[in-house]
């Protein structure tokens, strides 16, 4: 490595907000199943605190050695609906509290996996878990919940979509932060290191390390050097930058897995913003030539960014996975917040951007009087984009305040302007229930 590359790396960290957003340990809880919920909770606590006992210390050591910030250390676990189903319990709050206590005791930032996979219907544990979500998130600090309501193979479970519209409302009423820790997915992935949607899939090894990188500031600085150049040059520049970012992510993941004695899973190539100035995906898109994010051309700019990041990342790392696309969370991106306040970015444009990025309606505040059926219809729209386009989509919305208010979440979650919602009703559509069938192109065998 020549001196220029060393200087570039130093600049990435000190001036361009490059960091490893998270190292996430995925832990299988399938061997914690028990017919007694209190025994199951004890087993869950024991396994997490044993397997992840050194996760935070190892993360801090690697960050100090490499001089690269590792912002979060997290844990993801087997969807709790699968564990709880073996019990006769009528709610899974004891399991949520066991997760929370384990997370607090080992010092991680979040623990994900209070989850249910219901794309084709409910089993007993799914229904109980979903009804437990509002209180589980209200009575814990670090637990994150997710529900997968659709997949390209299965279609969309519209009964679950309707339920989740109601659950999101109840969760927002039960606690200030609850709805920010709840994600509704279509085509959820099993190796996602990012919260709030991380869970440890049943097809995964017993324990793995997955890494999520972050580098929108680095990409923006690289694009500043090619202003006025063609799209070919633009794409190549993003690709080379993504290669460098991902290479560091792979190094951190390998070091962590070796020191913790667990397998290395994947590097998630997602560009994840923070509320800090200079760490915004929106500003990357504007650097491409848009006056403000949300104007015409935004979706095309996002498509170029997303594709080039993936191409550069795949070259840098032999194990990529997770969501691996640009994140566009409104409250966590100062450029997105400015675009909403400037009247350039609305819910409809964010929905269009979902066809490209990895999440979609993410960390968006809407008026608290929004009907649960309207929230369910938003989920259905996002799920439809994911199911038809064979990609992951998700909704993380917070019904709080009234249009024009600013809702402060603090930390990485930032501040969200309350956005306008279409006032016309979707209630009769949502009331139908049942299943939207899988698309014709899902039949691959």
Curated annotation (Swiss-Prot):
Family to which this protein belongs: Belongs to the UPF0210 family.
Subunit structure comment from the entry: Homodimer.
A Pfam cross-reference name: DUF711
Taxonomy, superkingdom: Bacteria
Name by which UniProt lists this protein: UPF0210 protein Sez_0396
Gene3D superfamilies hit by this protein: 3.20.70.20
Organism: Streptococcus equi subsp. zooepidemicus (strain MGCS10565)
Signal peptide segment: none
Coiled coil start-end: none
């Amino acid at each position: 490595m020549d001196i220029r590359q060393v200087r570039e790396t130093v600049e990435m960290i000190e001036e361009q907000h490059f960091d490893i957003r998270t190292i996430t340990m995925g832990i299988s809880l399938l061997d914690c199943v028990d017919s007694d919920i209190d025994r199951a909770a004890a087993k869950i606590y024991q396994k997490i605190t044993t397997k992840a006992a050194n996760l935070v210390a190892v993360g801090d050591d690697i960050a100090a050695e490499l001089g690269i910030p590792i912002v979060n250390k997290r844990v993801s676990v087997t969807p709790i609906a699968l564990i709880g189903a073996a019990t006769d319990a009528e709610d899974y709050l004891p399991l949520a509290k066991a997760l929370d206590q384990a997370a607090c005791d080992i010092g991680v930032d979040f623990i994900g996996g209070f989850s249910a996979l219901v794309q084709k219907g409910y089993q007993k544990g799914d229904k109980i878990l979903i009804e437990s979500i509002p209180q589980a998130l209200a009575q814990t600090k670090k637990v994150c919940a997710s529900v997968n309501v659709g997949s390209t193979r299965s279609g969309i479970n519209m009964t679950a979509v309707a339920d989740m519209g109601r659950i999101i409302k109840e969760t927002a009423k039960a606690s200030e932060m609850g709805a920010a820790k709840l994600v509704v997915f279509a085509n959820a992935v099993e190796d996602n290191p990012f919260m709030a949607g991380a869970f440890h899939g049943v097809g995964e090894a017993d324990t793995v390390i997955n890494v999520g990188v972050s580098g929108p500031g680095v990409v923006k600085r690289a694009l500043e050097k090619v202003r006025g150049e063609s799209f070919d040059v633009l794409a190549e520049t993003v690709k080379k930058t993504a290669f460098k970012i991902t290479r560091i992510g792979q190094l951190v993941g390998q070091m962590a897995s070796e020191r913790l004695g667990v397998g290395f899973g994947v590097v998630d190539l997602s560009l994840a913003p923070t509320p800090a100035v200079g760490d915004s995906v929106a500003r990357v898109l504007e650097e491409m030539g848009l006056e403000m994010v949300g104007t015409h051309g935004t979706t095309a700019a996002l498509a170029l960014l997303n594709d080039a990041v993936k191409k550069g990342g795949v070259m840098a790392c032999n194990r990529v996975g997770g969501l691996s696309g640009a994140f566009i969370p409104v409250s966590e991106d100062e450029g997105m917040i400015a675009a909403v306040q400037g009247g350039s970015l609305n819910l409809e444009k964010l929905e269009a951007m979902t066809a490209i990025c990895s999440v979609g309606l993410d960390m968006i505040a809407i008026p608290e009087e929004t009907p649960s059926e309207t929230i369910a219809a938003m989920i259905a729209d996002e799920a439809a984009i994911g199911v038809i386009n064979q990609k992951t989509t998700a909704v993380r919305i917070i019904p709080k305040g009234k249009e024009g208010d600013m809702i402060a979440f603090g930390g990485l979650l930032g501040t969200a302007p309350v956005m306008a919602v279409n006032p016309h009703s979707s209630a009769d559509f949502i009331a139908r229930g049942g299943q939207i069938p899988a698309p014709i192109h899902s039949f691959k065998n």
